[in-house]
């Protein structure tokens, strides 16, 4: 977040009352959503309500010690972010202040109030390579040059979306900082490498298109059963300790997006520390470079001011849209949207608004929709295509999925990954309940899997779903009468389903090989279980007792496929052994 520019001189106001993060001021000449600086320390805040000459402000910093009578300075500008080279590999707070720069300024890891810094380094020079020539006509959004921001990502310098465009009269390659002019147009407009954009305003596009390509996560249960599309939306609700954050970390590490924006919204500080420590050491499987080269982190932990939780999700989605405009596929992880909703509830109650269900404000659904609807696969105004995929964790108290945040989120998103405390207690991770989860993208993504993985992907997956569904029904009977009371074919189905659960749905996030599973391997593990199923039922039909079928030496080797680096050879040998050992029984 940059210091707001004084483009519109405004009169200062006087603080009238202070209630936590909510401050009221009188005689302040301001507009809705303007940034203001509150008190003698200049704490950043945002106008959220105006009634007569009384202005209500939510303050993005701790307000202890602020008293009535202190001044409030208006800026005339809405809450905006700096967009330009230098955002990748950066760690921001909820209003885009770079934490490493603030630490240098303060000389301490503990930040004083009222300290500000530009969102991107204004002094650092970048190597600019033109993409257009003098005499070319450019319009709003057009790419005029590139900057090698990291080894993985070329930053594309664009004409601002609100520009009138024109003919290029001056452009040259060289090293420039972000405030220097790199392109001059015939109408006198000068284009720099950075631009500002209000966080609450969606960046313009030509058209929102139907997504047809999956966002490959490397997690078998997600890619195999509940895929999300590039440009899709997903929710991960679950009780405490069920694995929401580790699942989000896995997605941030291995999703095949070009850019990842990770927003830690009101979660534990040590979880953000884990991201900051792990990501620089991890290798991006697509490029071979460090994962941080494609990652932007926004850390707004639980001990930071409540009001900034709202700004951090908008800051994250605006940065994601900026990279989308370059033609990149962006994945945004928000962990957790429940903390943002709780911040809305606190501020709403301080404003004495009429509460809705469980005390949340009546506009909870509208705010969530506003956020998730900025996701999508778009044709950009410069002719490129890009996507923003949004994956939001939800933390319902006690794992109650009927609470308002979960229910309102489910009305908006198209993929639902339900985390289950019972699975987590049984050490089944990722603890995504395959009976409760769903993906509405499954059918529209099937053609991609048929073309790029295997033609029989949908049929094999449907067999796995049917087997797991049948197991869920049989388990209710087993709990009443025991497994031995079932017919032999149903006992065999339970055994096959167990291998599906243990070999295919379970995955070790901390194993070097098993942490990431490509779609081909996901298919082969599923198909190996189906091979065992088909051969086992043939043996059963030939009169072989179920105990002998399940007792073959080859079957337990299914559970070790996930950790095999050279899995194709391993599975080929395993399938041959399964079929030959079962044939020997009859």
Swiss-Prot record:
It catalyses: ATP + H2O + 4 H(+)(in) = ADP + phosphate + 5 H(+)(out). Its EC number is 7.1.2.2. GO terms for molecular function: ATP binding; proton-transporting ATP synthase activity, rotational mechanism; proton-transporting ATPase activity, rotational mechanism. GO terms for biological process: proton motive force-driven plasma membrane ATP synthesis. Has multiple subunits with at least A(3), B(3), C, D, E, F, H, I and proteolipid K(x). It is a peripheral membrane protein. It is an enzyme of class 7 (translocase). Component of the A-type ATP synthase that produces ATP from ADP in the presence of a proton gradient across the membrane. The A chain is the catalytic subunit. Keywords: ATP synthesis, ATP-binding, Cell membrane, Hydrogen ion transport, Ion transport, Membrane, Nucleotide-binding, Translocase, Transport. It is found in: Cell membrane. Pfam families: ATP-synt_ab (PF00006), ATP-synt_ab_N (PF02874), ATP-synt_ab_Xtn (PF16886), ATP-synt_VA_C (PF22919). One of its GO terms (cellular component) is proton-transporting two-sector ATPase complex, catalytic domain. Belongs to the ATPase alpha/beta chains family. It comes from the Archaea. ATP binds at residues 238-245. This is A-type ATP synthase subunit A. The keyword Translocase applies.
